[in-house]
């Protein structure tokens, strides 16, 4: 699977601060997006508050096909902060591709891959270096 972010303006930036969890509703949304975009990939940016991923940012002009997805970083709103990306692998393989590794290094600290069958067991999180990271699933009130 090929995933890439096109270079954009410097005003859109990855936010610092340790991400340790993902909101259950946000995870459910990412999985549902995978189902609805199947057999194509999708890619979005992720936002967080107090270390919990709880925002999904679809970016205008971004897209995906059966073996690739991309984000148009020059379309990210000025001043918007994000902590990473999420994208789907319709074939169900929730491991980073070679292209994913370069995207991870350029676009934040946490990257989520969801895969078919898009259930609570078919996703993984990775750090900038492509190594798996553990995210707690929490319910925000």
Please describe what each predicted stretch is.
Residues 1-82, 91-141:
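Conserved beta-strand-loop surface patch within small alpha/beta domains used
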């Amino acid at each position: 699977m090929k995933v890439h972010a096109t270079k954009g303006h410097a005003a859109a930036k990855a936010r610092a601060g340790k991400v340790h969890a993902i909101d259950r509703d946000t995870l459910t949304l990412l999985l549902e997006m995978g189902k609805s975009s199947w057999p194509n990939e999708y890619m979005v940016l992720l936002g967080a508050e107090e270390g919990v991923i709880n925002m999904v940012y679809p970016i205008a002009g971004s897209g995906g096909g059966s073996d690739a997805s991309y984000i148009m970083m020059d379309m990210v709103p000025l001043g918007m902060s994000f902590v990473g990306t999420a994208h789907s692998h319709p074939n169900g393989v929730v491991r980073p591709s070679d292209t994913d590794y370069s995207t991870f290094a350029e676009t934040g600290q946490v990257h989520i891959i969801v895969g078919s069958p898009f259930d609570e067991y078919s996703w993984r999180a990775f750090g900038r270096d492509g190594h798996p990271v553990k995210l707690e699933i929490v319910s925000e009130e």
